[in-house]
Amino acid sequence: MSEKIVQLNEEVIKGQLKELVRGSVEETLNGLLEAEAEKLTQAGRYERSEQRQGYRSGHYNRNLMTTAGEVKLHVPRLKGVTFETAIIERYRRRESSVEEALMEMYLAGVSVRRVEDITEALWGCKVSSSTISELNKKAYEHIEQWRNRPLKGGKYPYVYVDGIYLKRNWGGEYENVAILVAIAVNEDGYREVLGAAEGMKEDKESWKEFFQWLRNRGLKGIKLIVGDKCLDMLEAAGEVFPESRYQRCVVHFYRNVFSTIPRTKIKRVALMLKAIHAQENKGAARKKAEAVAEELRNMKLKEASKKICDSIEETLTYMDFPPEHWQKIRTNNVIERLNREIRRRTRVVGTFPDGHSALMLVCARLRHVAGTQWGGKKYMSMKYIEMQEDEAG
């Protein structure tokens, strides 16, 4: 008797399993939306309750792309309470990531057909060429709106500035394009990306236009500008924000000193420099700097000694501010970390067709980071500035 052989269509089974998973995900997410609505209104659908906080007013549909495929969400409409669901918030973040990824592929020179294939592999559905063009246009518009938004953080006591150099191809020739970036700590102690602009090169006119642009959007109340040594930036800041003071990034200052000494002596000199900024007040730091400069002269490191004598004062400005803030305002580390993230992203693109494309991708990344825990977590307590002002007044 011959055995019965059952032939299975693997593709059909895969499709059925995928649809089963997709349906299960859709059902689960809609169940979660209903549960969130019940929790907000403190009552189930059609339930009469004295504790009810709001009323249902039907649903609206919203498509959500998941790893299981596209699902349709039935989002409850509520009256009397605001329905902010974590599911929709995750959708918004995902949508932002998709926009950024599409823009990166576009700027990297990936063909529209290739982008269609990639989106189908990643998100389970093919994005048409017209959709890709529309998304890029939409992304650029969103970024420009975000980039030129009014600054509503009140006063911004601490501002950090830097310039990022990227490559662009202009008529077959490669040249640098500078993107000027500024972030700040607002009066409530939260970090905020103030903005980014194309500077062509870090000259005085570029910095002045950049600072004026920030001021016109609402930047005010600056007490300290932190950045690397750039005379053009300092002159521009002094003209636009004459009430501000300057703190030279201590880390960049150390590197500048290290550039004048043999590598074998860097470790020892680093400890000497750190000892200056470990002092409890500016007077003690100045005395320590004098001693370090003298020791460097004895070590035959005259150029390093001269740099300390000439520039140490601009690295000590932070000591005029609350000690609780010293560690976070004496360096540009807060913006350097952002710059590393930007460079990691822009490295994928390599060379940009123009400065505007470079600016858009930098801003896309800055906007993304600003919307994460980076911008939502308190960075420092500003009560110490208020206490210092009360004591001085």
Model-found features: residue ranges?
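RNase H-like nuclease fold core
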Residues: 74-79, 87-92, 125-226, 231, ...
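Mobile genetic element proteins and their domesticated derivatives, centered on retroelements
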Residues: 33, 68, 80, 102, ...
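Short, conserved DNA-binding cores of transcription-related domains
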Residues: 1-89, 167
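Conserved beta-strand -> loop -> alpha-helix junction used to position metal-binding or nucleic-acid-contacting
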Residues: 224-231, 236-272
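Acidic/histidine-rich catalytic cores and adjacent linkers
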Residues: 2-4, 35, 42, 107, ...
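DNA-recognition alpha helix
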Residues: 113-124
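Short, amphipathic alpha-helical "recognition" segments used to contact nucleic acids or chromatin
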Residues: 97-109
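Metal-dependent DNA phosphodiester-chemistry modules and their immediately adjacent helices/loops
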Residues: 84, 257-291
